[in-house]
From Swiss-Prot:
The keyword Disulfide bond does not apply. A lipid is attached at C20 (N-palmitoyl cysteine). Gene3D superfamilies: 2.50.20.40. InterPro entries: Csa, Csa_sf. This is Uncharacterized lipoprotein SE_0145.
Length: 253
């Protein structure tokens, strides 16, 4: 199911301008570095004072809302796919943050079609601490939620310029861009993911960086990262992370 979904994504990427050359890769790296050089942002409340990329959808009086999202998905051979993660909506107008922790299991129904079973646990953030706003069914899950850390809080991309031979795509009309690199298990961020998650493979991941916003602009657009350890019809292991800046009226949780 994951495999087929990714095929659709790859087909859509074919509309992008590929093979941009070394100069475009350097330009894209430089743009990503405007955001990634700030990692780690250990205190998420710093987002209250951080400006983002604003398009025509923004009201002039709206300071915007940051959405941070981290999740790990594991589908072992012969078993269902499970995703655990958290989403926070950091509202710069009200300087309040709410969101939810979620556990999503994807199984096949009697007709072989994928079926989602997602459970959400609402949370808020105060003083950089995650606090469940409703009773949690067990202490283990409660601790898992309270101790959750977003990738943006511990990642470090100081060596991004050392990433070489990336697959580069750029669409100036959106504008959007992406870069894909093969990493090794000695990479700092790979080590951090293995430290925090029980990743059942020794295979090193590929890193896909996706972003939008003006490459030459000074403001920060949306940034999406995906570490794919295993991807095939029988088994999938991947970690995804997103930092997005949106109009506050689109704040949903």
């Amino acid at each position: 199911m994951r495999y087929l979904k990714r095929i659709t994504i790859y087909i859509s990427l074919l509309i992008l301008v590929s093979g941009c050359g070394n100069s475009k890769e350097a330009e894209i790296k430089q743009n990503f570095n405007k955001t990634l050089s700030m990692y780690p942002i250990k205190n998420l409340e710093n987002f209250y004072d951080k400006e983002g990329y604003r398009d025509e959808e923004f009201d002039k009086k709206d300071k915007g809302t940051w959405i941070v999202h981290s999740e790990m998905t594991i589908e072992p051979k012969g078993k269902s796919m499970e995703t655990r993660g958290m989403v926070l909506y950091i509202n710069r107008n009200t300087r309040t943050t709410k969101g939810y922790y979620f556990i999503n299991e994807i199984t096949d129904d009697s007709n072989g079609r994928p079926k989602d079973d997602e459970k959400r646990y609402p949370v808020k953030m105060e003083h950089n601490k995650i606090i469940p706003t409703k009773p949690i069914p067990n202490d283990k899950l409660k601790k898992e939620i309270e101790n959750f850390k977003f990738f943006v809080q511990y990642a470090n991309f100081k060596d991004i310029n050392d990433y070489k031979n990336g697959d580069i795509s750029y669409n100036p009309n959106v504008p959007s861009y992406s870069a894909k690199y093969q990493l090794n298990n000695n990479d700092y961020n790979v080590k951090q993911l293995r430290k925090r998650y029980d990743i059942p493979t020794k295979q090193a991941p590929k890193l896909l960086l996706k972003g939008d916003g003006d490459l030459k602009g000074s403001s920060v657009g949306s940034k999406n990262l995906e570490f794919t350890f295993v991807e095939n019809k029988e088994e999938n292991i991947f970690f995804t992370d997103a930092v997005q800046f949106t109009p506050s009226e689109n704040d949903e949780s």
